[in-house]
């Protein structure tokens, strides 16, 4: 792996490239915080990272249950043909835990991150150019929790999970095809809108529809 300073240099370059998005004080705080967090993150995992990986992998041309899908994945870790999908997250992991829950009585559609994990498996498993098989999706939080610990949460996906999300994907696609859904209802707690937004389906499928129309 590259040395730690190269990672920090990349972070600094990116921050300066987007300097206009911050006030002077916010930029300085973010630079200081990012430097500290990334150095500690590097030290935590440098000796355990999988070296057989693909990063920022675009997957296109997938058709699942008659629905065209595409996506960009942060990282794929390989053990032969078996894949662990890694999705990097920032923010407080404790606030994210409910989003990783499978469907239950209070949230029959499942959490946003849970749906994202299942969507990744559907996408990769049905990518005909490769014979990859997703065994898990891992959410890697680059910011420490309240105790200063860096944490990862891994989700394994069952056939029942895939069937649930398949039905959701199909429903979204049918509504888009009927020009019945574009921007959503605007309610922040709407399961429907959150599913589309967090799995990039609205953008992906809308873009595809425009391409077909052209």
Ranges and model annotations:
Residues 1-58, 62:
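A non-catalytic, helix-rich entry segment at domain boundaries
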Residues 5, 110, 114, 121-214:
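Metal-dependent nuclease catalytic regions and adjoining charged, substrate-binding loops involved
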Residues 8, 53, 82-87, 136, ...:
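Short, well-ordered strand-loop elements centered on a beta-strand within folded domains, enriched
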Residues 14-17, 89-101, 140-152:
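Short acidic (Asp/Glu) and glycine-rich catalytic loops that position anionic groups and cofactors
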Residues 22, 26, 105-112, 157:
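Conserved aromatic-histidine-acidic binding/catalytic patches
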Residues 36, 40, 84, 119-122, ...:
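Residue-level signal for well-ordered alpha-helical scaffold segments within enzymatic catalytic domains
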Residues 47-52, 64, 130-132, 185-186:
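A generic structural signal for short, non-catalytic loop/turn and secondary-structure boundary residues
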Residues 54-127:
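Non-catalytic protein-protein interaction segments used by genome-maintenance enzymes to assemble
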